């Protein structure tokens, strides 16, 4: 990858690893979950729609209203408030680990709805391993504590929404400018979320922590992150960009420990390892093209003979 792509990759690993910290800060400051989600969505929609309007790419959205609405509902309107609600009851690091199960649900849905996906033995093993990680995470770390179990369940529902949304995007919205698609989806999601935000508004003006958290979530973690990610996809492709999925929970857990003083238990660590292993296996256990290519070049060097005074030697690089 180019230096610019590496910078974008680093930015995305951070920008999609930190939302759990800032969601936790916002809800701990007394901002209701629906209002956190609504505020984040409105801020991001304004930024992305402005960029799409400037690029003249809003026109093709005509006729795509029902697919935009379906995508907005599954990818934004369900996950954003569910994660915020869940983080009222569970640690930010636990929320991030549960969201790491998204590739598992994508693979599970693809077997049923994507004819190009086959239920191979490796994929099924990955699904069982990863879903076992979710069970271990919730069962050991949360146990039978009612509020925490409810919060973890809400975040699992968010992960399912994150998994279903891309299928609609791939089939019906993939040919459009992503700034227009995401901006339009965020605007529709804002309409979905407005009644819930009005029914449960903040009882007091949020403090500096709450306001900063909402600003960072909307502008940086949603709008700017999506623009950077779109550029990264165009340069390196989806395969390499997908590595971010494996880094985000590590960033989120690290921030939860360092900033919030969270201490992930044995169930959280075991669940994270099982979920990441299951995600890798359920996506056919392929390394990202960039890493796979680099490893293949190293192997080729090791296999290549070096002729020195008529004797073939295998030299380590």
Where are these regions (language model features)?
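Glycine-/small-residue-enriched transmembrane alpha-helix faces in small-molecule transporters
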Residues: 1-39, 85, 144-171, 191, ...
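Hydrophobic transmembrane alpha-helices of multi-pass small-molecule transport proteins
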Residues: 48, 69, 101, 109, ...
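Juxtamembrane helix-entry segments on the extracytoplasmic side of multipass membrane proteins
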Residues: 1-5, 29-38, 60-66, 124, ...
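Specific transmembrane alpha-helical segments of multi-pass solute transporters/efflux pumps
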Residues: 15, 19-20, 49-99, 135-136, ...
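C-terminal transmembrane-helix exit sites in multi-pass transporters
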Residues: 47-55, 59, 83, 102-125, ...
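Helix-helix packing/entry segments at the starts of transmembrane helices
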Residues: 39, 76, 95-101, 166-191, ...
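C-terminal-most transmembrane helix of multi-pass membrane proteins
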Residues: 41, 139-140, 194, 210-212, ...
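Hydrophobic/aromatic residues within transmembrane alpha-helices
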Residues: 26, 36, 40, 86, ...
